[in-house]
């Protein structure tokens, strides 16, 4: 085989991979659009009237996750399953965003932390890498940290809306998250930096709870602060 033939063959490989990446990008763009629609829907809970609409908004968000499943099913067909991490960078950020959105829905519904397995059911993907297109542990953790930031914001807006007990519940939840993350030995630089922001979320919520307690808005809040 001549030198030119070798490079022609290599160009064929490069072109084929570029085609794969282009197909992946198209699906990821659709995922990003659906994620924006879900986020817009859930952002309504930060508004005064949005608190009464939480069940309705969560139900509607779950309907949108049906579209997410369809897009992810399509994405799985665009590349060989064993090459997941070769193309992972294309969908990593939108998948983390979808984890956050799924976690936010579950929290609004039950004030609990969604498990990684439950997220994979919502998204229609696998929990284990051996089974193909899956939810990487670090992507799950990143999504959970985005949730913490969103909840710290919700604690402030809850007070504005006159819901004085919600910040206490959020404070308990975020402190439990912080305790959980302290058990992990995080090696991923991006994840570790994002975790550094969790302490600010914890502090922000604690300040809201403390402010409520000294102003006497909520007996439950005040009692909890006295116990501390």
Curated annotation (Swiss-Prot):
Q: Where in the cell is it found?
A: Cytoplasm; Nucleus
Region Leucine-zipper: which residues? 177-198
N6-acetyllysine PTM positions read 187, 199
The alphabetized UniProt keywords are: Acetylation, Cytoplasm, DNA-binding, Endonuclease, Hydrolase, Nuclease, Nucleus, Phosphoprotein, RNA-binding
The region called DNA/RNA binding is annotated at 86-90
Pfam families attached to this UniProt entry = Translin
| Residues that bear Phosphoserine | 190
Report the main location listed first in the record. Answer: cytoplasm
Q: List the disulfide bonds.
A: none
InterPro entries attached here? Translin (IPR033956), Translin_C (IPR016069), Translin_fam (IPR002848), Translin_N (IPR016068), Translin_sf (IPR036081)
A single GO molecular-function term is:
sequence-specific DNA binding
* Keyword Cell membrane found: no
Q: Under the cellular component aspect of Gene Ontology, which terms does the record hold? A: cytoplasm; endoplasmic reticulum; endoribonuclease complex; nucleoplasm; nucleus
Q: What is its EC number?
A: 3.1.-.-
GO BP of this protein: siRNA processing
Q: Sorted alphabetically, which SUPFAM superfamilies does this protein's record hold?
A: Translin (SSF74784)
What family is this?
Belongs to the translin family.
General function of this protein: DNA-binding protein that specifically recognizes consensus sequences at the breakpoint junctions in chromosomal translocations, mostly involving immunoglobulin (Ig)/T-cell receptor gene segments. Seems to recognize single-stranded DNA ends generated by staggered breaks occurring at recombination hot spots.
Outline the subunit composition.
Ring-shaped heterooctamer of six TSN and two TSNAX subunits, DNA/RNA binding occurs inside the ring.
Protein name, as recorded? Translin
> Which organism is this protein's natural source?
Bos taurus
